[in-house]
Every structure is written in structure tokens, then in C-alpha cells.
């Protein structure tokens, strides 16, 4: 286990999945409903945003797999929750999304962040490099 590499991979996953969420929201809000696709020409920038968001999801998955290789599942999984806070902050801050900060949402996101910090505050004992139950083939 290489914990710094795991943290870096988890951070990459959080950033990419957050970008994917924002890109998907921006693109889909500018495209017609699926039942109207036959009669309208979709906005190319919106289609590109959705395509890039799908690619960001795929890249996020690769980062997530790397994070799972180097971090305990409980720690890694809690880090994914940081994307909720990041998406909320960016969506409410950037005018393109027309989202607003509210007391309830901010309190909820604050609790999520507090949970992530709590789970990751304690250092855990280093895991063995290999599992004793695994036998060399």
C-alpha cells in the first residue's frame, strides 16, 4: 500500500467526478428533451460538454480503482463524499448553474465534510504488503 499515491488517486477521482457532474448538468440543461431530438438541432457546445463529462466519469473510475489499491475501503469511500461539497460550492458560486446557497444545503454539506474529516482524522496502522492467506502461485 502506498498511502500518498492512494490519496492522490482519490483526489483525482473526486475532482474528475465533480467536473463530470458540473459538465453533465451544464450540457443537459442546454439540450432539448429526448423526445424532441428529432425535430431540433442540438447545441454543439452542450453535446461536447456531455461527452467530456462522460469521459471525466471514465477517468474518475480509473482513479478510483487506483485509490482502492492503496487505501482502506472505509477511508477511500468517505473521500468520495468530498465531491458533494465541491459540486455544491461550485454550482452555487458559478452563474452558469443558477444554483443558490441555502442554510439547509450548506448545513448538510458541512456535516458531510465533518464526516469525511472525522473518518480520515485518525491514522490507521499500516496494512501488510500482502495478505497472509494469499499463496504464491
From Swiss-Prot:
Domain of life: Bacteria
Disulfide bonds listed in the record: none
Periplasmic domain ranges by topology: 27-44, 98-100
Membrane topology note: Multi-pass membrane protein
Alphabetized GO MF terms: carbohydrate derivative transmembrane transporter activity
Metabolic or biological pathway: Bacterial outer membrane biogenesis; lipopolysaccharide biosynthesis
InterPro entries per the UniProt record, alphabetical: Flippase_ArnF, Small_drug/metabolite_transptr
Chain segments annotated as transmembrane: 6-26, 45-65, 77-97, 101-121
GO annotation, biological process: lipid A biosynthetic process; lipopolysaccharide biosynthetic process
Family recorded in the similarity comment: Belongs to the ArnF family.
Function: Translocates 4-amino-4-deoxy-L-arabinose-phosphoundecaprenol (alpha-L-Ara4N-phosphoundecaprenol) from the cytoplasmic to the periplasmic side of the inner membrane.
Protein name as annotated: Probable 4-amino-4-deoxy-L-arabinose-phosphoundecaprenol flippase subunit ArnF
Gene designation per UniProt: arnF
Amino acid at each position: 500500500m502506498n498511502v500518498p499515491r492512494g490519496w492522490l488517486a482519490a483526489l483525482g477521482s473526486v475532482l474528475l467526478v465533480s467536473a463530470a457532474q458540473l459538465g453533465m448538468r451544464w450540457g443537459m440543461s442546454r439540450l432539448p428533451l429526448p423526445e424532441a431530438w428529432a425535430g431540433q438541432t442540438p447545441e454543439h457546445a452542450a453535446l461536447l460538454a456531455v461527452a467530456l463529462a462522460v469521459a471525466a466519469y471514465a477517468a474518475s473510475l480509473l482513479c478510483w480503482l487506483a485509490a482502492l489499491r492503496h487505501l482502506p475501503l472505509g477511508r477511500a469511500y468517505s473521500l468520495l463524499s468530498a465531491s458533494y461539497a465541491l459540486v455544491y460550492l461550485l454550482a452555487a458560486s458559478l452563474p452558469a448553474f443558477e444554483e443558490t446557497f441555502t442554510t439547509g444545503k450548506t448545513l448538510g454539506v458541512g456535516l458531510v465534510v465533518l464526516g469525511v474529516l472525522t473518518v480520515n482524522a485518525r491514522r490507521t496502522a499500516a496494512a501488510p504488503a500482502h495478505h497472509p492467506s494469499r499463496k504464491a502461485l
